[in-house]
Amino acid sequence: MSKPRVLYISQHLTPYLPETTMSHVSRMLPQGTHEKGKEIRVFMPRFGKINERRHQLHEVIRLSGMNLNVNDTDHPLIIKVASIPSARIQVYFIDNDTYFKRKAVLEDADGNFFPDNDERSLFFVRGVLETVRKLGWAPDIIHCSGWMTSMVPLYLKHVFADEPYFDKAKIVYHAYDEGFEGALDAGMAAKAEAHGIPADALSSIAEPTFDNLNALGMKGADAVIVGSENLTPEGQAVLAGLDKPILPYSGSEGFVAEINAFYDEMLEGKTEAVAE
């Protein structure tokens, strides 16, 4: 029997960015999953704040070179990779000079949210899925962490609907309280619609706030993991109304075993038993 395959798509990951709850889990969970006998692939954005020399990132030429159109402009997709020696795992980075070269993450030096963070999110999501397809690697579970990954379910359902590499994958959305104030560019839905996602599927992000994007990810996934002790009130309300497997927040210890048991239940079709 082949090993289960888990694709991790994460907004933040240590040691490449400062540690938060999300970046810590996104670092330790893939390692633990690998140690439990599953195959993994890990993707994150190559934010310009990441020190390429220190972490020994290098470009994967055979995976780079595709152009992704966002907002009527073609942007070259660059794929880089690095290893975490202590974990014996590789991390793939989605890169592009327009979106990720700036020496920052999501905000400028004055704390202002970048006005193109919506496009950066769309480029990241599509870049990951296009790269996984190019790798010819079919995941059983796609684990999404952070609001930047909230569009993954819609892209899989509508843009990659006929892609055999994804047709059996279960989507897990890991919901955190690590968000932002205000809203992304109001044209985000239209930009995603141009990729082939129906307008009615995007109506909830006519105003792309953190809560609306988080809700989109939770509603579109096959299962939800709660990654923060306290989600926002809006997030809690969405969670309470979901009719799907949910793994409650369980603290900062023991999550590898709990989440992998959740994976196993999902793959065996028995998740209702752990969805309290």
List the predicted regions and their residue ranges.
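Catalytic cores of nucleotide-sugar-dependent glycosyltransferases that transfer UDP/GDP/TDP-activated
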Residues: 1-276
